[in-house]
Each structure stands twice: as structure tokens, then as C-alpha cells.
Amino acid sequence: MFKVFGFGAKEEIPELSQEEKTKAILKQAHDFEQALRAMDYVLDDNADEGLALLDESDAKEASDQTINALARGVIEFLEATLGFEAEEMKKASATLAKAEALSLKSRERAQKIGLKSSSLYPPGTVYAVTYTESCLLHALLMIFSESMMEAAKAILKLRKSYYMLQEILETIKAANKAKKLKITSGSEDKESTPATFITGGDAFNSVDIPYELTPEEQKDKDLLQFAEQIHSMRTERLSGAHIGNSPAINRLRGELGLQAMEDLPEEEITDHKVLSDDIDLSQATIDEFVHSGVNLCFGILQVVISLLPPAIGAVLSVVGFRGSREEGLRLVWKATKQRNVHGCIGLLALMFYYDGPFQFTDDDFDIPAAVKDSSNSEDSEDEEMDGPTLLHPGKILEDALLQSRALFPNSALWLLNEARMLSGKGRLEEAVALMDSIDVSKIRMRQVKSLMIFDRAITLIHLHQYDRAAEDILSLLDISDWSHAFYTYFAGCCYLENWRMCEMGLMKSDKKDEYQKKAEELIFTSVNLLGKKTFKSKNLPLDRFILRKVEQFKAKKEELGVENPLDGIATSPVHEIAYFYNGYNRMSEEHLELTKKMLTEYRNPAIEALDSDQELIKDLLVSLTLRRLGHIQEGCDILDEKVLPKFFSIQNGKVKYIKKTEDPWAYPTALYERALFTWKLEGMDGLPESKEWLLRAQGYADDYELSTRVGMKIKAAIDRVDHSL
């Protein structure tokens, strides 16, 4: 009956009657709903059930192989990007390539037979969206591979995706305008009127069929039953009833943290209800997929392009790429309002942007965003989130996350993001307590389990709880195939700091000798693991960082002739790791004071040697600690007098850089932080000078380890200044 989307047939596609088209349209909507349900299972930590649903659908005659392939590709993409493991990335790439090819075939067939499955858009539009989505995700995996050949292919894919997304977005805007005009004029279009079934005197409207039915179709019981089934599938998905969980409304909180869970009302509601007023219950499945897919893909694409360093950005602009961070964020926010996988991926992207370890919206660079004048906007919907709200979404982001926590109670991924949000607000103890509330051994998705343990370890070092942080990190050696070298080095740095705290009398422990032994063993053997258990063909940026650090430690030990290898380590390396993961913005005053004490009062032969490069790292970190403690001028003076002169000067009005290689990440970072000092000291009046410092940071152009991380942070800060000047 529904052989329209069968693949492999060479014969010419015959013309279809309206009845055949109606059946094909309903089958398409059904298969898309089935795929959306499968992907939601994965977001609730039940990938096996989701994949089983797709297998079941694949086995049926004339199922929509295109959406099934994309759904499988999205699942594998999530697994690959959460864990960055070679085999997972390879598998996801192959599936997404298949989805690309199937999308083009399906689009062509839908256009040939005139299959109008949307009341707004021309035939085949939904497959243009599946194509761009699979293309974009595939391109991102190619970029992550760090192969020059794959990166070149990725640019071509991104270009195709970019232009098709622009085309679809314009179609959406035009359709929305036409719809508003029809509503205003009161005119009706039979081609966009939902189908009505009549049975036993009752009427049922199906929004999935965008035209009037023939008298025979209106009385077709099989057709009616199928349309009602799709309506039921959609209603259950929108309320969260489709994946076997109890009503989400009973888990919906108004605040973050464990205490808010305990404060939930005891009386339970038995009916499933939608959690947001933004959800449109009358929207057809295909239209919903088109809207959310385009908003998500074009939004993420624009944000990523806007954050790329100037050198890459200039190349992309030549081939037609333009990225607007604000417009991109608005589109991603729009996607989050849809109760489907696009909304969830959009929320994960926003959580990474606002509360991830890199925090592109730096807490210390709290410039108020300029409010954009939207009075002359052609599309008021595009302006519903103004600049200040985009910069600091606050409660809006919290509520979006809490909805996902309620909808997906079995998934540690959403709990992890809540913990990250708590950590971003400086509520570190609460973040650890929340992560401790779940048994990590019961997390099914291995990549999420690894992330949970890693994030907890990072949070623990911000709390100076190094023993437990080291245990967590070392446990990842048996779980994750990411960088075993970094895990080992990280744990060694934790034990080193514990040993130093024992030496300073800040910590009483009978394990002091054990800490010393473990620190020495783990730090200096970590480099032996480089190139092993890593997802790329070459070492990760953090791996290259480790190699350089350990070589420095060994060289200093030989230079000083000390017996204890730990005496060859000056500035405690765990504080560098804390900076990379935004620790200084998250520590309480108590922990900042302890950090300052450890950086300034511990003594050993390497520190007393006053090595210029080691002093630079120490002074940079001390200056940031002072700024967070409120001693802004004192911190700025240290940066100006002890850090910047070692690699930067202004001669005859021109900037001069002294190229150094000892700690490459530190030099552009110091210039970036100097911009933040100017902002803290001078406010809005200092923004022009802040921008000068940021441009100098950007101008320290070099391909150094962590350059992508530092470069994107600098670029985001420049954009913020530009919007406020």
C-alpha cells in the first residue's frame, strides 16, 4: 500500500491518486513520530529501546528509511560526541552519510510525485531538512577528526548545508507571512485546510493531511484509524507519555538542586500534561520537524561560525559563510521550544554555551548587552529574545533544563547539566551532592557515565577535595577510551597538591608518603600513555600540554640536581587544570583564599629558583585569584608588572610580541585577562581599551596547544564588546 518510499527500484515512479498520496502522507508522519520516539528513548538513557524501535520500523514494508537512518545517525552522533571515541565516530559518520544519500533520493521522489505533506511548504521540504541535518552532523564529525583531508570535505558539506538552510529558512518566513495575510483577510485555502473524517455523525480533523479529503476518504475507517493513531502518538510525545514514564508534571520543579526535589508536592497528578505553553498541540508532525530542525541546524551553524578564530572565519567568508552569534542563539532558543529531539539537542548546545567548562559568557566580563531596536522588524518573532536576555538567560535556561529533567527522569545527562549549572553559579557543594545522588554504575550510556565522573572530579578540585577527585579520574581508565595520559597526569597533580598541603600543615593525613609516591609515579609515567586510548590519530591538545609540562619538570630536576622529582615542579599544575575548566570563576571566597595560599606560600627548590617562566604562570594565576577576591587593582598590577612585560610591549605606539614557547597557552590568556581587568576597573568607559587588549590577545597568533579553546573565548569576548560599544 505504501511503496512510494521504497528504495533500490529502478522503474519510473508512477503517478499517485489522491487516496494513495493521503496514505503515503500518513505513513510518513507515522514513521517520523516513531523516529522521534526512538530518539527520546536515548535522551532518557534507554538507547537499546530506541534502537529496537528503529529496527522494528526498518523491518516493515515501505517504512521511511530516510528518517530511520537520520534517527540512528543522531543517536550515534550523540554517543560519539559525548565520548570522542574513534569507533563510535566512524560508525556515526557512516550512518549519517547514508542518511544524506537517502534524503536526496526521498526529496527528489516527493517532488516528482507532488507529495504535499505540509500545509506550508512545497513537496520534499522535510527531506531537505533531513539532508541538511545529516550533512551538518557529518561535517562536525569530520572536523573533530582533525584530519586536513576530512576538514576540507567538511567545509564543502557545511557550505551545502548552509545554503540549503538559508533557502528553507526563507521559505518558512514567506510561508508564515502568507499565513498571517490569509488570517487577516479571512480567506480560506482548500489546499491548506486540515482533513476532516466523518464517522457515525462525529468528525475528526487530521492536521497531518494538509488538504480536504474526498467523500470516500472521509468515510474510510482504516484511514481514520491510522490518522487517529498518529494524533495519539504526537499527543503522547508532547506530554512525555510516549516512553513509559509517569506524568512529568509531578517531577517539575521551580528551582535547581536536591532540596527542590524534596519540596515537590506529595499529591500526584495521574494525567500526562504538556509542561510548556509554547507547545503547539495543533501543529502537524512534519511541520514541527521542519521548523525545529531548521532553527536548530542554522542556529548552531551560525554560532559556531561566529566563534571561529579570524583566520578560519576569513576563509569561510570567502566561500559565503556568515555567522551572527545573536541570530544563531535566537534560532537555537526557538528550537528548544519544540518538544522533540531538536529541542533537546538545542538545549544541550545552550547549556554548553552558557554553563559548559569554557563559559563563552565569562562571569568576570559581565558587560550589559545593548538592547536591539526591534520596532522596524519584519518578523517580530525573531526579536522575542533581546540582547540582554540572550547574554544572561538566567531563569529561562533553568526552567528549560528543569522541564527536561522532569521529562527524562532516568537520564544522567540532564542531571549532569543541572550539576554544571549549579557549579556555574558557584554552588559547588550542591553540584557534587546532586552528582552523588545517582549511582553511576547504573548509567547505561557509557559516555554519559564518563562525563559524570569527569565533571565531578573537576568540581572536586575546585573544592580542594583532591583525594576523591583523583579516585574519580583514575576510575575512568576502565570506562573511557579518551585520553588515558591526561587522566593519569590529572590524578598525579591531585596527589601532588595533597602532599604539598600536608607539608604546609594545611592537611593532616597519615597518607602523606602515599601521596608523594602516587604523585611522582602518575605524573611522570603519564607521558608513556600518549598516543594510546585516544580518539584521534594524533595527540589531543591536552596531551601535547602534558608532554611539554612533564619534560619541563624533568629538565628542572636535572638542572637543580634534586633527588625528589616533585621538587622539580614549581607552580602546582592542578591550578592550571582548574583554570582550563573555569575554576576561578566558580570557587567560593574560602577556596580562593586557599588557592592563593598554595600558589604563594609553598616553597621547594624549583620555586626558590625563581624560574622566569614558572613565575609567569604563578603570577598570572595569582592575579586572577586576587580579582575574584575583589582585590582588582592589586591583581592588575601583578599582571602589568610581572607577567605582560615578559612577552609583550608597546614601542613607538606599536605592539611588539616576544614569541615564547615555554607555556604557549598563557600568553594570549594573559592579554585576554588584562581586558577583563580594564572592564572591572573602568566599566563602560574602559570598553575601548578592553577591546584593544582583546585584539592584542587575538593578534598573538600562533598554533599552540589549547589555541582553539582560548581563541574561541577571545572571539566571544570581542563580539560582546562590539555589541556594547
Curated annotation (Swiss-Prot):
GO terms for cellular component: cytoplasm; nucleus. SUPFAM superfamilies: TPR-like (SSF48452). It comes from the Eukaryota. Keywords: Cytoplasm, Nucleus, Phosphoprotein. The keyword Cytoplasm applies. Its main location: cytoplasm. The modification Phosphoserine is found at residues 246, 377, 380. The modification Phosphothreonine is found at residue 196. It is found in: Cytoplasm; Nucleus. Pfam families: Iml2-TPR_39. The keyword Cytoplasm applies. Coiled coil: none annotated. Present with 1770 molecules/cell in log phase SD medium. Belongs to the IML2 family. This is IML2-like protein YKR018C. It comes from Saccharomyces cerevisiae (strain ATCC 204508 / S288c).
